[in-house]
């Protein structure tokens, strides 16, 4: 049984479906909408997307489990994904993971006691030329050191910016394209 999402989420998915000749093409953005509203994708969210798109839930689940940008369990308000593949590993990704573990007192896949942070190690995020890097919610932070990551996290804790894709995409469209995303928050 699918969970009930807001009327706004329903309308957004209906609008998305109109943008594609085949509604199945809207699976990924529909998953984002469900995740933005619920915080993660549980089985009810998968069912909700499947019902809206008109396909079997297993096909939606295949997409949701393939990509690391979809959270299959609850995460912190700010979810850090540390790239661990070759370029990032050679440039210091392990140190970033260790630093997060020590700073937050959690292991990958856990949520901090205050609910503010979680982190995980993921496969390539596609920013090999600026390794090591992390993605916090939907924003890339590149050429990181543990000290630079601390600066970013401290600023996030102070300013509590909205780092969801829908809001950062809108802001990037307002003349900010080309600036480092870490300067935008």
Regions from the PLM with identified roles:
Residues 1-185:
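Signature of N-terminal electron-transfer/Fe-S-associated modules in redox systems
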């Amino acid at each position: 049984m699918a969970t009930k999402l807001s009327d706004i989420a329903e309308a957004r998915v209906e609008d998305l479906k109109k943008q594609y000749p085949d509604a199945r093409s809207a699976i990924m953005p529909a998953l984002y909408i469900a995740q933005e509203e619920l915080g993660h994708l549980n089985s009810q969210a998968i069912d909700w997307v499947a019902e809206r798109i008109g396909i079997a839930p297993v096909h939606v689940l295949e997409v949701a489990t393939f990509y690391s940008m979809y959270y299959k369990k609850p995460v912190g308000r700010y979810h850090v994904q540390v790239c661990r593949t070759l370029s990032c590993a050679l440039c210091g990704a392990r140190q970033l993971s260790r630093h997060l573990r020590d700073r937050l007192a959690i292991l990958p896949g856990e949520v901090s006691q205050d609910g503010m942070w979680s982190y995980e190690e993921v496969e390539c995020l596609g920013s090999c030329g600026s390794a090591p890097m992390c993605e916090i919610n939907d924003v890339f932070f590149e050429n990181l050191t543990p000290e630079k990551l601390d600066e970013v996290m401290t600023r996030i804790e102070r300013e509590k910016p909205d780092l969801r894709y829908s809001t950062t995409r809108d802001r990037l469209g307002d003349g900010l394209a080309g600036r480092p995303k870490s300067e935008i928050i």
